C-alpha cells in the first residue's frame, strides 16, 4: 500500500472504519477492504446503507499512482488533499470521472435507456466529493473478484467457464465500439454460486470508445493533424491500460506518445501517433484475456498429462499474443476450444507425440562414446 495513504490493516480495523456520506447525509458507505490498487484509483469493497437497507458495492477513490507525491492523506478517515497543481489536477480528475461514467452508461443501458440493462456491467455513479478526491460507487451483489476466487480450489472446467464468459463480455463491449483497457482478475466480479455464477466487469476508468479517438488523416489539414496528436498526447487513458501494457497496440501508443512529447514534435511523429491510436482494436482486450486464462489454469487442479497438454496450448497462445495478436473473439475462442477438447478427450497431439518419442529413445551404455571414438581411430 502506498506511503501516506490508507494502510490495509487500518481499513480492516473495525475501530477505524472509513465511512463516507453523500452530500445530504442520507446515504452512508462503509469501506471494508481494498480490492485493487490501480493506476488512477483505489478500489474498495464496501457496504452501502440507503433507505434503511444495506447492500454490497464497490467504491473507487481517485488517487493516481503516478502522482502519489502530491496526493496526501494524514490518517484514516481524513480527506485526501492535493499539495500542488490543485486546479489542474482537479480538472484532470473531473475529465477522467466523466469519461468513465459515460463509458459505463453506454455499455450498461440499452439504446432506449430503459430497464433492459447489460448483464455484464454494474451501474456506476458519482457518490460524493470528499476533500480533493472523488468517489464513484458501483452497485454490486454479494460476490468476490476473480482475484479472490482464484485463491480457492479451481477445477479446469470452472476455468473454462470463466474464460468463455469473459469472451462473451469482450464481444459485447466490442459490438458497442468499446475497449475496456484494464481486464484483470481484480476487475472481474463473480456473483452467485456454482452453475448460477455469472461474471461482470468492473472499472471503466481506462475504457474508451474507439471512434472518439480514431481519425481519418486524409480529411485533416496539417494544423488539424497536430491538434489531434496533441489531444492524444495529453489523454491519460490512451496507452495507460495497465493490464494491456505489452499488447502490440498499447506498446505502439506508449512509444509514439513518448516520442511526440519531445521537443521535436514533427509532422511525421504526429502522423505516427495518430496511426498507432487508429490501430487500437479488440486485440488489445483479448491480449488481457489470454493473460487471465494463463493465470486461471496455473491455479487449476488437474492431472499432470492434462497440465502438460494445456500448457502446450497456452504457450502457443502467449507467443501469438506477443507477435500477431488475436484479432477477433472467434479466433481466440477456437484456441480455448482446443483446451476444452483436451479436458474432454485427453492429451494434446503435441504432448502425445513427445511421449511417443520418449518411449522410443534407446538407453545407451556409459562406455558407448568411448567405444565409438576407438572405432573411429
Regions picked out by a protein language model, each given a short descriptive name:
Residues 112-134:
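Short beta-strand micro-motifs within the conserved protein kinase catalytic domain, predominantly
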Residues 130-145:
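Conserved short submotifs of the Hanks-type protein kinase catalytic core
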Residues 162-163:
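Activation segment signature within eukaryotic-like protein kinase domains
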Residues 344-377:
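Regulatory extensions appended to serine/threonine kinase catalytic cores
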Residues 1-26, 32-33:
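Juxta-kinase regulatory segment immediately upstream of eukaryotic protein kinase catalytic domains
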Residues 192-254, 258:
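Activation segment/activation loop of eukaryotic-type protein kinase catalytic domains
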Residues 174-192:
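Catalytic-loop of the protein kinase fold
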Residues 42-102:
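ATP-binding glycine-rich loop module of kinase domains
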Amino acid at each position: 500500500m502506498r506511503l501516506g495513504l490508507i494502510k490495509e490493516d487500518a481499513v480492516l480495523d473495525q475501530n477505524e472504519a472509513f465511512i463516507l456520506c453523500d452530500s445530504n447525509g442520507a446515504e452512508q458507505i462503509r469501506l471494508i477492504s481494498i480490492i485493487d490498487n490501480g493506476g488512477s484509483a483505489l478500489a474498495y469493497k464496501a457496504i452501502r446503507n440507503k433507505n434503511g437497507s444495506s447492500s454490497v458495492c464497490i467504491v473507487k477513490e481517485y488517487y493516481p499512482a503516478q502522482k502519489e507525491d502530491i496526493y496526501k492523506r494524514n490518517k484514516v478517515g481524513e480527506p485526501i488533499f492535493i499539495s500542488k497543481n490543485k486546479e489542474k489536477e482537479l480538472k484532470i480528475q473531473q475529465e477522467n470521472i466523466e469519461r468513465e461514467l459515460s463509458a459505463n452508461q453506454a455499455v450498461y443501458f440499452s439504446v432506449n435507456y430503459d430497464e433492459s440493462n447489460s448483464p455484464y456491467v454494474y451501474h456506476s455513479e458519482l457518490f460524493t466529493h470528499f476533500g480533493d478526491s472523488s468517489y464513484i460507487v458501483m452497485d454490486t451483489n454479494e460476490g468476490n473478484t476473480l482475484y479472490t476466487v482464484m485463491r480457492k480450489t479451481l477445477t479446469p472446467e470452472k476455468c473454462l467457464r470463466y474464460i468463455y464468459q469473459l469472451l462473451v463480455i469482450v464481444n459485447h463491449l466490442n459490438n458497442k465500439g468499446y475497449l475496456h483497457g484494464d481486464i484483470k482478475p481484480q476487475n472481474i466480479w463473480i456473483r452467485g454460486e456454482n452453475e448460477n455464477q455469472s461474471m461482470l466487469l468492473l472499472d471503466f476508468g481506462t475504457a474508451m470508445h474507439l471512434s472518439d479517438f480514431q481519425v481519418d488523416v486524409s480529411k485533416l489539414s496539417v494544423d488539424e493533424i497536430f491538434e489531434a496528436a496533441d489531444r492524444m498526447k495529453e489523454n491519460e487513458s490512451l496507452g495507460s491500460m495497465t493490464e494491456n501494457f505489452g499488447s502490440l497496440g498499447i506498446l505502439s501508443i506508449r512509444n509514439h506518445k513518448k516520442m511526440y512529447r519531445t521537443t521535436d514534435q514533427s509532422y511525421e511523429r504526429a502522423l505516427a501517433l495518430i496511426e498507432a491510436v487508429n490501430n487500437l482494436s479488440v486485440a488489445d482486450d483479448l491480449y488481457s484475456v489470454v493473460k487471465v486464462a494463463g493465470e486461471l489454469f496455473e491455479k487449476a487442479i488437474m492431472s499432470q498429462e492434462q497440465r502438460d497438454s494445456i500448457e502446450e496450448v497456452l504457450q502457443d497462445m502467449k507467443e501469438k499474443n506477443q507477435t500477431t495478436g488475436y484479432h477477433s473473439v472467434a479466433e481466440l475462442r477456437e484456441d480455448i476450444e482446443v483446451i476444452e477438447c483436451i479436458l474432454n478427450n485427453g492429451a494434446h497431439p503435441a504432448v502425445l507425440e513427445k511421449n511417443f518419442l520418449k518411449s522410443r529413445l534407446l538407453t545407451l551404455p556409459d562406455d558407448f562414446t568411448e567405444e565409438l571414438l576407438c572405432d573411429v581411430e
